[in-house]
Structure formats: C-alpha cells, structure tokens
C-alpha cells in the first residue's frame, strides 16, 4: 500500500544521532523491528510500509542487530516476512556490499516485489557521484537496483529529496515511481525555484513533473507529498501553487489529484459544495481506484459544524463530491487535539490516523499520540494498540492493508508487547482479526436509566461447535427481547436511540433478560449464541465471508416507544 507521507527517523548514520473494548481486545499485536530470531532492535526504527495482503513489511532502522554483519553504522532498510517471521536487509549493493550512507523513506509495491527508498549512499549503483540523497528501486526477485531520481537523459539530480517530505511510492508493476525533489535539472525548464513532485517511468526512462496543470504548465510554487495509485494512473500531491486549477483563490496549500493518463488536475481538499479550504491541507492518499482521497486539514469550512479548532482528517469522494470529517468518536464527537497522517483502505471504508485527542475513545488518558481506525460504514472509531492496552508512549504514522485488517505504526510505548526493554521506537503491526468484530451506532437509554451495550465472545464460524455469544447489558430486568440482524447498517432515529440495521431484517427467537425481581432496574442481560443460526443453514445468506450487522431489541413499556435497543455489532462470518 502507498504510505502516508511520513517523517522517518533518518537517513542519518548512528554517529550523527544521540545515543471500543471488545474490538480493541480482539486485536493482536506484533513487534516487527526484530531479527529473524526475535532479537529486538537496539536503536530506533521507522513506521512500516505494508503490502496489500499484509505479507511483507518494510521499515528502516539504526539498529545493528537485526541481521548479521551490520557494521556500517547507518540507517538501513529491512524487509520483514510477517508470515515466516524473517528479517532481511535490502539496502545493500548488488554485490552484497553494505551501503556507505544512510537509507530510509521506504515503501513497498503492493505485491512486495519492489522496494523504493532514498539513500545518501554512493555505492548502490555505478556512477553515483552527486553526493546527494537519491531515490532507488530494488527488485527483490532479480536483486537489481536502479536509481530513479535522474532526468530523462540520466543526469544525476543536483539536489536532495528531503527527509520530512519525500516518501517515494511505486506502482505494483514497478514501472512508475513518484518522488519529491528540490533539484532543478530533472526536467528541462524547471523555473519555479522550489520543490516539485516527479514521475519516473522505469521502462521508458522518462522523468516529468507530476505538478503540472492540464495545459502542461509547471506549478508556480512548492509541491510535495506525492503518492500514487497501484496502477500508476492517479497521483495525489500537496501544493502551494495557484495555477494548477482555475480559480484557486484561497492562497493556501491544497491537495490535488492528477490523472496521469489525461493530465487533468483536480483540487480535492474542498467541501461537499466545492468551497475551498480556509486552512492548509496536506498529506493525501488515494484508494486504488482513485475515487476516495483522505487528507489532513486545518480548514474549518470543509464540513458543517467543524468547531474544534484543530487539524482534522477528512475523506473526499471524487465521484459524488462529498467530503466528510472522519477524525471523530463513534458518537460524532470531534477531537480535542490534532489528528493527521491518514491512510485509507482500498474500498474507502476504513481510515487510520494518529491523534493526540483524548475524546475519540473512552478512557484515553495517556496524553500522547495514539493510532485510531474509523469505519466509514458503521461510523465506529476505535484505538489501535492490540489487546486494548493503552500505550505509555507516543504511537503514530499508521499504514494499512487493502481490507483494513492489519495496521502498521511506530511507537515509543514500552507496554504494547512483553519484553520491550530496548528504550527505542519500534515498528508494530496490529491484526484486527479475520472476524473484524466491531460495535457501532448508539443505544437507547431505557426508562430505568440503563444504556445497553452489545458485546461478543468467540468467533462467528460455519465449522466446529464453539459458540459465538452475543450479549447486551445492562438492560431492564425480567423483559423479553430478540436479536435483529441484516447485511447493511442504517442509522435513522429511533426515539432515544438508533435503529442501526438496514432492511430487510431477520429476527431470532425471543430471549429473556432475567435479573432481579421487580421493580425495574438494570440487572438484566440478553444473551444469544449466533453460531447455531449460522450452522443451521436456515438463512442461505449466512455464508463465509458475509458481513452481518446485528442489534438487540427489548420490551420497555414505561418508555415513550414501549421498547429499547442496544447499540449494534458488525462481524464477518468465518469458514
């Protein structure tokens, strides 16, 4: 997956640096900046970039104990096989020599074959004499390394990629690479005296500006943060230029998408009515089809009611024109601190981001950055840490796999995995689990003051005999209820709560809440094992891979509606 534009640790040599509850609990976490034998890195590591299927991860590290023979004293690039548990160093010359300079700012092609990275090393390719940080591509199958930050004529760049903005990205087939550079000699006629975003074609050898307008004119101000869809057709970038589209009148940094096949450029950091942002926008990432783009923005006018005065994360739908705020809690509460570094799943459903806000999930008391995942379908937001643990150090810069199941990030926390004693920033991957169980929506408050929450234990599965227990508590004692389920979410108002499932609905047999004898209190609970329904074959729609949305309904005769509802749960049926 294409990474967000990340502040990586480096390109520096070691000598230059000073020595929701159920959903969260279902997460498993692994520290990946370790050796093939599990030895933890003895220095800082960057956030990982992940392949689409979560098989491979790439990161850079100053650690010298991740592979044998690491004696160059510089940051190197490592690829971790998450399935086999092996780690290899890939920022080496084709003859196996260690690089003689620091390497970083890495990303993987979506299938893991190609690694693109930046390096100050001069011994990775022949003829590297510019003494600059260059961009390279490694083919992990052939072992070949190309330098791609060159002109169409093969001339070396006369300036660097900058460590804080240049995270090069490569298409799946390895043909196209986008990167940022301050060089003036990569394209003829480079006259803006500023940073530009570039596209290099590894088949034809051509290098051109990404930041051109439809008429072919170069951007008249700084452009950075280029990213690319896996097919190489669409690029997204950030620019201060005013000449990329007509009527760019806000005088601020915006996010743009360019169709590289047609040359058409679109300003996407706008409201649903097309209003340009009244604050800077930055760090865009596209879904593979180019439809959805997520980005960060300080603007207050992209959605109605943006009143928190903080940098937020937004998603713009290029098909419908709709822009939505996604750095919010499950109930829509806006963050009380900065959010950013957003990445998006391939279907546009899941957006991961980091935030210092304390209002996005309950009990966020660590006063530092965390990584969150927002589900645009269910509107639920959860904190990504693994096992529900709150990190005791900053956690940031997420990456995401195609379906949103696995989330990578870096963290300085020491309590995310056992045995974290290296006092370094490490790279982690959280697996949310195949079932992807998550709560969403809002429960009604009962006449007795109960707010029933739905939860689960076990896994929804067609095979075996293990249960998948669904439970709503607290509910009013001694009342009958039932579980409704369907295959899409919905949120029309239902008195004090929400009916969270779209029609058509199926209903289970009644269940009894039990609890104390009258009068009414909140001692009841509704429980149902869903797996016998799945395995019975009565509902032909309950097949492996199907996502189910469910919610408990129960009697509450003293309420205005005569009934109450829990919040809702979504899960995917497993084989």
Where are these regions (language model features)?
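Bacterial N-terminal signal peptides that target proteins for export
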Residues: 2-11
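Residue-level hotspots within well-ordered secondary structure
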Residues: 434-575
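Bacterial N-terminal signal peptides
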Residues: 10-20
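Conserved "turn/edge" positions that cap or connect secondary-structure elements
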Residues: 24-434
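A generic alpha-helix propensity feature with a strong bias for hydrophobic helices
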Residues: 6, 71, 97, 171, ...
């Amino acid at each position: 997956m294409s990474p967000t534009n990340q502040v990586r640790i480096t390109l520096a040599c070691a000598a230059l640096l000073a020595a929701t509850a159920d959903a969260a609990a279902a997460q498993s976490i692994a520290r990946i900046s370790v050796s093939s034998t599990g030895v933890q890195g003895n220095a800082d590591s960057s956030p990982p970039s992940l392949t689409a299927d979560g098989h491979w991860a790439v990161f850079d590290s100053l650690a010298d104990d991740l592979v044998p023979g690491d004696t160059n004293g510089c940051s190197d690039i490592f690829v971790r096989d998450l399935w086999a548990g092996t780690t290899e160093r890939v920022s080496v010359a084709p003859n196996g020599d260690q690089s003689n300079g620091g390497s970083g700012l890495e990303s993987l092609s979506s299938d893991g074959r190609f690694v693109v990275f930046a390096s100050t090393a001069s011994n990775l390719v022949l003829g590297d004499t510019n003494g600059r940080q260059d961009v390279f591509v490694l083919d992990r199958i052939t072992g070949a390394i190309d330098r791609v930050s060159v002109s169409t004529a093969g001339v070396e760049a006369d300036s660097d990629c900058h460590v804080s903005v240049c995270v090069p990205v490569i298409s799946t087939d390895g043909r196209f690479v986008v990167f940022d550079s301050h060089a003036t000699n990569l394209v003829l006629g480079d006259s803006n005296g500023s940073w530009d975003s570039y596209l290099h074609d590894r088949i034809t050898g051509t290098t051109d500006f990404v930041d051109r307008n439809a008429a072919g004119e170069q951007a008249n101000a700084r452009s950075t943060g280029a990213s690319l869809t896996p097919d190489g057709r669409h690029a997204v970038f950030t620019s201060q230029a005013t000449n990329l589209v007509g009527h760019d009148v806000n005088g601020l940094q915006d996010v743009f998408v360019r169709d590289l096949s047609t040359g058409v450029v679109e300003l996407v950091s706008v409201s649903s009515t097309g209003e340009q942002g009244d604050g800077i926008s930055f760090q865009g990432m596209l879904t593979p089809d180019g439809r959805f783009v997520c980005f960060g923005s300080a603007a207050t006018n992209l959605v109605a009611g943006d009143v928190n005065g903080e940098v937020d994360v937004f998603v713009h739908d290029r098909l419908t024109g709709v822009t939505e705020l996604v750095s919010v809690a499950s109930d829509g509460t806006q963050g009380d601190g900065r959010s950013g570094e957003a990445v998006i799943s391939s279907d546009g459903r899941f957006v991961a981001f980091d935030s210092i806000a304390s209002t996005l999930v309950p009990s966020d008391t660590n006063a530092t950055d965390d990584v969150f995942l927002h589900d645009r379908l269910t509107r639920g937001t959860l904190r990504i840490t693994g096992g529900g643990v709150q990190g005791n150090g900053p956690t940031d810069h997420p990456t995401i796999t195609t379906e949103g199941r696995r989330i990578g990030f870096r963290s300085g926390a020491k309590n995310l995995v056992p045995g974290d004693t290296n006092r370094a920033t490490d790279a982690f991957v959280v697996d949310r689990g195949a079932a992807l169980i998550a709560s969403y929506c809002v429960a009604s408050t009962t006449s007795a003051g109960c707010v029933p929450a739905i939860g689960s234990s076990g896994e929804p599965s067609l095979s075996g005999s293990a249960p998948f227990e669904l439970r709503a508590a607290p509910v009013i004692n001694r009342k009958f209820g039932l579980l409704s389920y369907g295959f899409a979410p919905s949120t029309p108002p239902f008195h004090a709560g929400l009916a969270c499932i779209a029609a058509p609905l199926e209903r289970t047999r009644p269940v009894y809440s039990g609890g104390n004898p009258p009068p009414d209190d909140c001692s009841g609970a509704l429980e149902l094992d869903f797996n016998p329904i799945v395995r019975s074959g009565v509902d032909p729609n309950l097949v492996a891979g199907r996502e189910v949305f469910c919610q408990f309904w129960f009697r509450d005769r003293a309420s205005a509606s005569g009934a109450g509802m829990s919040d809702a749960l979504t899960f995917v049926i497993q084989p």
